[in-house]
Amino acid sequence: ILDCESTVALCCRPHGFGKSMNLSMLKCYLERPVPGSSSVNLFIGSQIWDAEDGIYRDEYARYPVIALDFSTSSYRGADVEAAMRDVVARECARLLPLLDVPDLARSDVRHIERVARGVAGSDEIDSALGVLIELLRMACDEQVVLLVDGYDAAFTNHMQAKGAYG
């Protein structure tokens, strides 16, 4: 993935083939820590850390990472839109500390704060991911990494609940 020149990489594997674990590891490696948090580099001495004389070390803890996980069982039978909005709202709350920089548009930051607190309207929630990506890009002056796990889970669970799938 780190060698990929594409802006998007889709990893399609059957259930149980390690997609979630790989995404979790990518998040741990790439994610810029929230200010004030303590972090320990778990990768020192690992293959990725030592590969090709440390070629990937500059990527460590460098990027703002949005990790959307739709694979949890709590979405079984749930409304697909509600499940997606909930996941986005939780990420807004988790990443809000990275937006504590002076040069960001206050109206956009307040937008993300409302989503994070669960008081945003439907339109605000629907646009939150795009706003969050742009704010993180500006706040961190880096590309934003978007990891999506279980992207089909909410839809599949919804269809199974209706008896229309599987």
Language model features with spans:
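Conserved alpha-helical scaffold flanking the Walker A/P-loop in AAA+ ATPase domains
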Residues: 49-58, 129-139
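Conserved P-loop NTPase mechanochemical-coupling segment
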Residues: 70-71, 76-126, 154-164
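P-loop NTPase signaling cores
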Residues: 35, 80, 126-127, 133-149, ...
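P-loop NTPase motor core
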Residues: 22, 28-98
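Residue-level preference for the first positions of well-ordered beta-strands
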Residues: 8-10, 65, 143-145
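Walker A/P-loop nucleotide-binding motif
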Residues: 7-25
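Structural preference for long, well-ordered alpha-helical segments in enzyme cores
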Residues: 22-26, 132, 154
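Phosphate-binding P-loop
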Residues: 1-6
